[in-house]
Amino acid sequence: MGIEFKNVSYTYQAGTPFEGRALFDVNLKIEDASYTAFIGHTGSGKSTIMQLLNGLHIPTKGEVIVDDFSIKAGDKNKEIKFIRQKVGLVFQFPESQLFEETVLKDVAFGPQNFGISQIEAERLAEEKLRLVGISEDLFDKNPFELSGGQMRRVAIAGILAMEPKVLVLDEPTAGLDPKGRKELMTLFKNLHKKGMTIVLVTHLMDDVADYADYVYVLEAGKVTLSGQPKQIFQEVELLESKQLGVPKITKFAQRLSHKGLNLPSLPITINEFVEAIKHG
């Protein structure tokens, strides 16, 4: 399910003394079954784009096309409910959205809200809980009795239970230890392998290099750079001038190249670096 922004602008609290422009004539495409990353500082427009993808915001100007459905300024139609079902949005610290008395009920709530029967919603909930690594003995527990990592998995299972075609992730591993971070990123990688479109908002450039196949760089509400991660991370000085940085291995390789190591291009993953050394 592809997504396209056509000349999209967004203004918060338009027509009030507090209005602020968040996006300026943004044009971009997110291809079906792609893994697209957005990087940029706070205030660059990343969160606004996330909420436009899901129909939580309506463009002030321009058009957001999700599959065959379009959202334009002033739209208040039934298509937005369809879009919210098909584009799952996982906010930073999604465990803060848990509220039901049991894990199973919490995950089943979303599908039921979209008209799925209780029996089918619970079946979906059980399936998605297993998918994210929550064992059956936890299904009837209060979600607030779980560890932080388990709570986050339950919250993500709640999004997956609505069977979205696109999963939008806002700093999904924030606050997790390295093991928990790796497990969660592997889960998203496996979902992508099964055909789900993944949209990742992150400040971790190593994750962009390891998982994404396309990157948008945002600054002050505009797309300033876009391309494949390999292409984007060759622009070390440009990214550092924006205080965004590059993957650790890319910076290390750049230092070696300045000391005389001959590299055809800067590697962006450890595997690439190893191959470059072997054949260098």
Curated annotation (Swiss-Prot):
Residues the record lists as binding ATP: 40-47
Pfam short name (any one): ABC_tran
PANTHER family in alphabetical order: ENERGY-COUPLING FACTOR TRANSPORTER ATP-BINDING PROTEIN ECFA2 (PTHR43553:SF27), HEAVY METAL TRANSPORTER (PTHR43553)
CDD domains to which the protein is assigned, alphabetical: ABC_cobalt_CbiO_domain1
NCBIfam families: ECF_ATPase_2 (TIGR04521)
Family named by the database record: Belongs to the ABC transporter superfamily. Energy-coupling factor EcfA family.
Membrane topology type: Peripheral membrane protein
Subcellular location: Cell membrane
Molecular-function GO terms, alphabetical: ATP binding; ATP hydrolysis activity; ATPase-coupled transmembrane transporter activity
Annotated source species: Streptococcus agalactiae serotype V (strain ATCC BAA-611 / 2603 V/R)
InterPro entries from the UniProt entry: AAA+_ATPase, ABC_transporter-like_ATP-bd, ABC_transporter-like_CS, ABC_transpr_CbiO/EcfA_su, ECF_ABC_transporter_ATP-bd, EcfA2, P-loop_NTPase
Transport recorded as keyword: yes
Membrane listed as a keyword: yes
E.C. code: 7.-.-.-
Function: ATP-binding (A) component of a common energy-coupling factor (ECF) ABC-transporter complex. Unlike classic ABC transporters this ECF transporter provides the energy necessary to transport a number of different substrates.
Protein name: Energy-coupling factor transporter ATP-binding protein EcfA2
Occurrences of domain ABC transporter (ranges): 3-245
GO cellular component: a single term: ATP-binding cassette (ABC) transporter complex
Keywords: ATP-binding, Cell membrane, Membrane, Nucleotide-binding, Translocase, Transport
Subunit structure as annotated in this protein's UniProt entry: Forms a stable energy-coupling factor (ECF) transporter complex composed of 2 membrane-embedded substrate-binding proteins (S component), 2 ATP-binding proteins (A component) and 2 transmembrane proteins (T component).
Taxonomy of the source species: Bacteria, Bacillati, Bacillota, Bacilli, Lactobacillales
